[in-house]
């Protein structure tokens, strides 16, 4: 949301008090990537999740491929429950920016493994195929990794 959206909200509300007026802190950020004025979702997600710019295609890492800590990690350290709830796959760039650290956004198996190794409280979304043994280069079922870490894996909407 940009400043023009906030201005439109103020007009719509007849200049009454809005949530923006009640907020203790607000920020204006730019999410263009470190290597391009036109960002992709991996770089934009990383900027939002970690407070750092990175290159297009990079996920949860700085331009030199060093892992960038996310606000999700801050919340986990503070003992807060955390989660990722998406209509895309959980391994997609935007949700992945909050828990994964890979130099290339399409490293879906590595992202899936990092999801399984994360301390998220809940993760809802697609991407089961990246955890199935038949789809993995190592042949190891990632679903078992998720279950071993205490995740309850649901594969049917009736569950």
Residue ranges and their predicted role:
Residues 1-158:
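N-terminal catalytic scaffold of extracellular/periplasmic and nuclease hydrolases
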